Amino acid sequence: MGARASILSGGKLDDWEKIRLRPGGKKQYRIKHLVWASRELDRFALNPGLLESAKGCQQILVQLQPALQTGTEEIKSLYNTVATLYCVHQRIEIKDTKEALDKIEEIQNKNKQQTQKAETDKKDNSQVSQNYPIVQNLQGQPVHQALSPRTLNAWVKVIEEKAFSPEVIPMFSALSEGATPQDLNTMLNTIGGHQAAMQMLKDTINEEAAEWDRVHPVHAGPVAPGQVREPRGSDIAGTTSNLQEQIGWMTGNPPIPVGEIYKRWIILGLNKIVRMYSPVSILDIRQGPKEPFRDYVDRFFKALRAEQATQDVKNWMTDTLLVQNANPDCKTILKALGSGATLEEMMTACQGVGGPGHKARVLAEAMSQVTNTNIMMQRGNFRDHKRIVKCFNCGKQGHIAKNCRAPRKKGCWKCGKEGHQMKDCTERQANFLGKIWPSSKGRPGNFLQSRPEPTAPPAESLGFGEEIPSPKQEPKDKELYPLTSLRSLFGSDPLSQ
């Protein structure tokens, strides 16, 4: 029994004795269950030593699983015990036997799916791929497989919906993967409208074909038997070559990828057409005052795809123009991020710019800055413009008379005379004419001191045959003064005295 009980030890044995036989039950697994499982394996002619490892338990489960449907209760109990022991070996946390069976079923399903996937991949690799127009038949010979109507329908639908927007080019490249020049011409012929664009495309193809003929001149002499002639520009375009010749060039040794060459010419022409159908330059893409940054980025990169430039130039446009053409709010945020910021960081930082929340936050910050500036200016003015006090006793600055240490001055602090105080001093009460105010006699200065005389001329001066003297005949020393004297305003008038 000692050898049979030594299947588990240490921490695994502790985990084994914590597992319950049934969900919610009180009984737990003990060493006696391991001894019983070993004896049962002996009875079924299986090696009890397999219980000492997870791999051995897995082999036992594979042998016992087919007999579960028709087996006795002892076989089911043995299967449950081995399944629980497998989870203990694998350090899988379980609480009871039911959880152990669920874990075993999950592992078996996963292994089954992996096995099926491996078999499927192996089967696919053993067969010739049917995804390309040129496939191999059972004899190993290359055979052309025409484009499906579904592929052509997808291409026509893209042209109808997108016209010649930048995303048409990658769509054409995906649908024409591995196609022959004949297949490419079929795709171009399915385009009913946009004949101006098609004519531009033909011109580009003719130019590239002429350049091909110039760079690849025909070798003099006849073609050797068993060899394929070299393709000309018109052959690559499918004008002067048939399908068999195209397949021969594409599958020859060495191969001449006429389909890929012709496809490259078409994409070059499509780039020119996309440029014509997208007249907006990348320099004209600017973010509106209230436009979200995400919409601005979408328009920017859509215009960037239509630009006829190298990838280095496009990268420079992205790093420079994307920030330069943003609105002031986003531009301030993007410049604060620095030149090394990624597009994700830019979009995250500018998220919500232009909305009501952002406007309220900007307004609050501006108001806070103005308030702080005013407070600092007020504090600065208070510090810079201190009130200068002067002592009336000694005449020095920096203290007042109450705190003055000099001997107390007698008399008036204003004029220095004795007999009166500063508040009664008349030195400071003289008006600008030099007269003391208020006067000790007469009415207050803001009242008229005499009755105003009429200023209109007498009735005799209005006519009745009397001659009005001219101003030139009046004496020069006679000057006109207002009838109301200054006495009415400032007390006594020195001119009237």
UniProtKB/Swiss-Prot annotation:
A motif (PTAP/PSAP motif) lies at residues 454-457. GO terms for molecular function: RNA binding; structural molecule activity; zinc ion binding. The record marks Y132, P133, L363, A364, M376, M377, N431, F432, F447, L448 as: Cleavage. A lipid is attached at G2 (N-myristoyl glycine). A motif (Nuclear export signal) lies at residues 16-22. A motif (Nuclear localization signal) lies at residues 26-32. A motif (LYPX(n)L motif) lies at residues 480-489. Residues 217-225 are annotated as: PPIA/CYPA-binding loop. Residues 189-227 are annotated as: Interaction with host PPIA/CYPA and NUP153. Gene3D superfamilies: 1.10.1200.30, 6.10.250.390, Human Immunodeficiency Virus Type 1 Capsid Protein, Immunodeficiency lentiviruses, gag gene matrix protein p17, Single helix bin, Zinc finger, CCHC-type. Gag-Pol polyprotein: Specific enzymatic cleavages by the viral protease yield mature proteins. Residues 7-31 are annotated as: Interaction with Gp41. One of its GO terms (biological process) is viral translational frameshifting. SUPFAM superfamilies: Retroviral matrix proteins, Retrovirus capsid dimerization domain-like, Retrovirus capsid protein, N-terminal core domain, Retrovirus zinc finger-like domains. Residues 436-497 are annotated as: Disordered. HIV-1 lineages are divided in three main groups, M (for Major), O (for Outlier), and N (for New, or Non-M, Non-O). The vast majority of strains found worldwide belong to the group M. Group O seems to be endemic to and largely confined to Cameroon and neighboring countries in West Central Africa, where these viruses represent a small minority of HIV-1 strains. The group N is represented by a limited number of isolates from Cameroonian persons. The group M is further subdivided in 9 clades or subtypes (A to D, F to H, J and K). This is Gag polyprotein. It comes from Human immunodeficiency virus type 1 group M subtype J (isolate SE9173). The gene is gag.
